[in-house]
Amino acid sequence: MEKNGNNRKLRVCVATCNRADYSKLAPIMFGIKTEPEFFELDVVVLGSHLIDDYGNTYRMIEQDDFDINTRLHTIVRGEDEAAMVESVGLALVKLPDVLNRLKPDIMIVHGDRFDALALATSAALMNIRILHIEGGEVSGTIDDSIRHAITKLAHYHVCCTRSAEQHLISMCEDHDRILLAGCPSYDKLLSAKNKDYMSIIRMWLGDDVKSKDYIVALQHPVTTDIKHSIKMFELTLDALISFNKRTLVLFPNIDAGSKEMVRVMRKKGIEHHPNFRAVKHVPFDQFIQLVAHAGCMIGNSSCGVREVGAFGTPVINLGTRQIGRETGENVLHVRDADTQDKILQALHLQFGKQYPCSKIYGDGNAVPRILKFLKSIDLQEPLQKKFCFPPVKENISQDIDHILETLSALAVDLGGTNLRVAIVSMKGEIVKKYTQFNPKTYEERINLILQMCVEAAAEAVKLNCRILGVGISTGGRVNPREGIVLHSTKLIQEWNSVDLRTPLSDTLHLPVWVDNDGNCAALAERKFGQGKGLENFVTLITGTGIGGGIIHQHELIHGSSFCAAELGHLVVSLDGPDCSCGSHGCIEAYASGMALQREAKKLHDEDLLLVEGMSVPKDEAVGALHLIQAAKLGNAKAQSILRTAGTALGLGVVNILHTMNPSLVILSGVLASHYIHIVKDVIRQQALSSVQDVDVVVSDLVDPALLGAASMVLDYTTRRIY
């Protein structure tokens, strides 16, 4: 597991700025502390942790038994825009000495605060690796700009949701350095015990308060519109006073505008009002219980849209500060909280409800994933970041490497019978190809793949080909993000839950991509074939089985569980023959090579296959090609079987046309030319008139699986990795 390039421990510096980010960083810190054989932990505390007005929250870090290596007073008081800028500058002045003394291998920073921006800037300029927690999220304020700026400085990213992961990818961050882990606070939140919650409620809200009969209010200034956010806070307090329920009010973050918000609280007498409890800080484990058993939470804190959903507690989200975040159904947005009546109406609608619990932001297992991710960091890798930019128009200028070497990929095709490895050039030329029988066991197969790839890589040097990576096409269902074969076809034994990426990458020291053969056929058409330049098309590959791939808006569709484009298992008959998938009536049960072989054997056993001009040697197995030969020589029964097979395939294509409405359907594989005319006839007879003009063509690619495997590598390099 260790990849840090030497035998010493990884020195990790965790820097925390305020009570909110500590709730996310503390679970990671506890996790690091439990593995002293792998990690050394340094803790740096700065920002509002060290300010009395905000509760001196550094004390809770000490209470958690963490040694604080450094305390940095970095907040310039004033709570306005200029003070925030000066605070960043003060942190930038102080941090270099600290980082020079600690010499961390990696610094962990969280979120979107201006303090975190100072930390990331310092570490980046001092060539210290940065792990950013909760990047890629969208809220809707200046926080977005700060968060995304930290993302560009950070070398590694831990995100909480699939959407955040996609945002990071769209920001051109290196895919291999992004971890979808979930929110670390959920590890503690989802395991919280409820038995003492009443004592916590009484401690903070009074002895007479019952569960679900109080409100938690947490509102911060919006630094891009301070005047409006202060007015909204004033209206919120008026609505809460009118609603007449016991309310716990937490002081706002130390942002521009926070001082004015505190003045509003004091002007309205909130600190002395019998229905209010105003506090600077609540420990996170107690805060969890308070929001879990509240009748409602109101304000604009990220906690309301992130953590509170795990309990189904009603939330009223005021204004635009969190408007871009993913939320559960427990959140009621009041974007224009411009009247007391509107906020009061929201309180009446939400208070006391119980919503389904949602776990959008985590499953309680983030910390183990993060620790594993940390252990995998290779300190010998170049520090310079790589960005994956989208495809651009090819540069007409020349590169000396392109002249002296042929940029190429190693392509691997795992078929039911053969295992093939090829060197494929950027132009789609197969420079060299190796073929072996596919072994029956996992161990033999993986060893043969490694052996063939090593041999091909050595040959590539002699052929002046620079190998950029390895692409693998295999039958079955594949998780291309992880490079894992989830479930294989029955033709490839011992090939379920197989990690292909790791052994090849470790052996060849090259990036590795994996996908199934149907998807690879579509990728081959997109880069080298008749799908080049098309926005939408579908490929059907006919061979031993039936597969396919769907290109939509120039991108390959994988589906939520990587099961998209299993086109061979479209059902075209309710009472058709059994299929290898366990169902019946699938296209594959009619039109695949296996299906034709089955029918050929039946005819042969009944002495109805052979016609004049045909013979089958005794040592040769009867197969699909014999059936096709018999049909060509006039065997009516063989012709009928092929017609039925082509009709089944044609009905599948009709269903695809009605579902996807692609601009082109490409039939690929050894049987495509035998089916094309029947498929077109079925479309004319069965399809809606509006899709009958869609082109259906036979692929002109000789090795679509190999070319598609290569295209995964070659497409990636054209994204201009820097």
Swiss-Prot record:
Pfam families: Epimerase_2 (PF02350), ROK (PF00480). In the N-terminal section; belongs to the UDP-N-acetylglucosamine 2-epimerase family. GO terms for molecular function: ATP binding; hydrolase activity, hydrolyzing O-glycosyl compounds; metal ion binding; N-acylmannosamine kinase activity; UDP-N-acetylglucosamine 2-epimerase activity. Zn(2+) binds at H569, C579, C581, C586. It comes from Homo sapiens. Changing A631V: In NM; does not affect homohexamers formation. Changing H132Q: In NM; decreased UDP-N-acetylglucosamine 2-epimerase activity; impaired homohexamers formation. This is Bifunctional UDP-N-acetylglucosamine 2-epimerase/N-acetylmannosamine kinase. It is linked to Sialuria: In sialuria, free sialic acid accumulates in the cytoplasm and gram quantities of neuraminic acid are secreted in the urine. The metabolic defect involves lack of feedback inhibition of UDP-GlcNAc 2-epimerase by CMP-Neu5Ac, resulting in constitutive overproduction of free Neu5Ac. Clinical features include variable degrees of developmental delay, coarse facial features and hepatomegaly. Sialuria inheritance is autosomal dominant. Nonaka myopathy: An autosomal recessive myopathy characterized by early adult onset and progressive distal muscle weakness that preferentially affects the anterior tibial muscles, usually sparing the quadriceps femoris. Some individuals may have involvement of the upper limbs or proximal muscles. Muscle biopsy reveals presence of rimmed vacuoles.
